[in-house]
């Protein structure tokens, strides 16, 4: 199980780097780019491990990431604002589903939503993107989020020497059933 977790963390790190590179050229707020590459990538990888890369849940989570990117784009027309407000509950539900899937802490959720809410409010005031620009951004987001997730076969063998900290440390998270299998107990139970 621990070797599996190590491989999962290495895959997660690779996918995070992949998404960061793919999302970098997109005109998106940095907190959204960071959230998708660092947090949402974990939800996508976890769902893919549980259900397979082409599962309905993975497709739904990819779509939610695309909708998140598009949700903060300016909406100048009343029809655009109305469509956004109609889609918002579904987006929030899917974001919460993904965050719950990886056990993202409540405090981090509050911080993220504290940034997202003003971005959504600001998007309702701005000058709408031209249709061409909107469609181009949507395609770029689809392309970035549609890239294949890394596979364990693509990973180089683990380093036998002492690892060098190059990036943020991705905190390993164990599902309740995994924690039980390796003998971990919940802090509240101690």
Predicted ranges, named:
Residues 1-190:
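Extended, low-complexity, amphipathic alpha-helical coiled-coil/linker regions that act as scaffolds
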């Amino acid at each position: 199980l621990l070797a599996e977790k190590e491989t999962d963390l290495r895959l997660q790190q690779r996918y995070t780097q992949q998404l960061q590179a793919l999302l970098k050229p997109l005109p998106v707020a940095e907190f959204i780019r960071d959230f998708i590459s660092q947090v949402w990538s974990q939800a996508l990888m976890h769902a893919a491990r549980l259900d397979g890369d082409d599962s309905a849940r993975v497709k739904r989570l990819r779509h939610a990431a695309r909708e998140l990117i598009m949700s903060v784009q300016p909406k100048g027309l009343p029809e655009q604002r109305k469509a956004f407000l109609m889609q918002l509950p579904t987006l929030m539900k899917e974001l919460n589903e993904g965050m719950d899937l990886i056990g993202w802490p409540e405090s981090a959720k509050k911080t993220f939503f504290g940034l997202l809410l003003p971005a959504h409010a600001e998007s309702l005031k701005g000058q709408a993107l031209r249709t061409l620009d909107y469609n181009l951004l949507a395609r770029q987001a689809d392309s970035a989020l549609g890239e294949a997730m890394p596979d364990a076969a693509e990973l180089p063998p683990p380093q036998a020497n002492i690892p060098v900290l190059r990036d943020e440390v991705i905190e390993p998270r164990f599902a309740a059933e995994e924690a039980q299998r390796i003998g971990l107990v919940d802090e509240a139970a101690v």
